[in-house]
Design a protein with these regions (language model features):
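Gram-negative (and chloroplast) outer-membrane scaffold detector with strong preference
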Residues: 62-155, 205, 210-212
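Outer-envelope beta-barrel architecture signal
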Residues: 33-41, 70-74, 133-139, 167, ...
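Bacterial N-terminal signal peptides
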Residues: 2-14
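Predominantly the C-terminal beta-signal and adjacent terminal strand-loop region
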Residues: 83, 173-221
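Residues that define the transmembrane beta-barrel architecture of outer-membrane proteins
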Residues: 37-39, 53-59, 116-122, 135, ...
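Sequence/structural signature of outer-membrane beta-barrel proteins
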Residues: 44-52, 83-85, 145-152, 194-198, ...
Length: 221
C-alpha cells in the first residue's frame, strides 16, 4: 500500500517539474517551478475521526520540494486511513432505505451490518515558513484528490456501495512546527484539517523527516 502511495507522491512533482518545450519560455521561470527539487522525505501518523465513522489512525508520506518563493515551500503528500461507519450512521442509512421502499407486507428488513470505509488522499501543500532555524513553525493550505472507498458484505455490488464510493478534490488547512534533531534528521508536530465531498476530518500528526542536504538550522559540518 505505502510503496504505491510513495511512488505517487514522488511521481506527481517530477511530472510538474519536467522540462517543457522551448515554445513556452518563461512560464516555469515566472512560477519558479524550475527551482523545485526533492530536498526532504518523511512520514507521519496520528489520530483521526472522520465524520460518521469510528476514530482511527491516519498514515502519511511527505516529499518536500523546496521553496517556490521566499519562505513559501511546496510539499507533496499522500495519506491513508481506514475505519468503519458508526452503528448510528448505518442505522440512519437503514431507516432511509426503509422509508424509500413501499412494503405492502410490512416485513422488509434492512441489516447492512458493518460497512468499512477508507480514504487515500494525494496532493500538494503550499506552506509559509517564516524562518530557517532549528525550530520552524509553518502555516499553509493544500489541494488534494481523495479516493473514498466503502466495502461491506451487504452492500457489495449494490447502488449503496456506488453511492458511498467517491473520487473528488478536497482542500486542506495545515499548521505545525518542524525541529531539526541532527544534520539530516528532523521531527515535528502537525495539525491538519481536510475537507472534501462527503468526508471531513481533523488530525494531529507526529512527523519524521530525512533531509538530503543539511537540515535547516544545522549548518554544514
Amino acid at each position: 500500500m505505502f510503496v504505491g502511495i510513495a511512488a505517487v507522491a514522488l511521481a506527481v512533482p517530477r511530472a510538474l517539474s519536467a522540462q517543457v518545450p522551448d515554445d513556452t519560455p518563461g512560464l516555469f521561470e515566472r512560477l519558479n517551478l524550475d527551482k523545485l527539487r526533492l530536498t526532504a522525505f518523511g512520514a507521519a501518523f496520528g489520530p483521526v475521526a472522520p465524520t460518521n465513522t469510528e476514530p482511527t489512525v491516519a498514515y502519511s508520506l511527505h516529499a518536500d520540494y523546496g521553496e517556490i518563493a521566499r519562505n513559501w515551500r511546496v510539499v507533496f503528500t499522500a495519506t491513508y486511513w481506514g475505519t468503519r461507519y458508526t452503528r448510528e450512521t448505518v442505522a440512519r442509512l437503514e431507516d432511509k432505505l426503509r422509508e424509500s421502499i413501499v412494503d405492502t407486507t410490512v416485513s422488509a428488513r434492512f441489516e447492512l451490518g458493518r460497512i468499512q470505509i477508507s480514504d487515500i488522499a494525494v496532493g500538494g501543500d503550499l506552506r509559509w515558513t517564516p524562518s530557517a532555524r532549528v525550530a520552524r513553525p509553518y502555516l499553509g493550505g493544500g489541494l488534494l484528490a481523495h479516493v473514498v472507498n466503502a466495502e461491506g458484505k451487504a452492500i457489495q455490488g449494490t447502488f449503496i456501495e456506488n453511492a458511498l464510493d467517491n473520487i473528488a478534490l478536497g482542500f486542506a488547512a495545515v499548521s505545525g512546527v518542524d525541529v531539526s534533531l541532527a544534520r539530516h534528521l528532523g521531527i515535528g508536530l502537525q495539525a491538519r484539517y481536510d475537507l472534501t465531498s462527503g468526508v471531513r476530518y481533523g488530525t494531529l500528526r507526529a512527523t519524521g523527516t530525512y533531509y538530503f542536504d543539511t537540515a535547516p538550522g544545522r549548518g554544514a559540518r
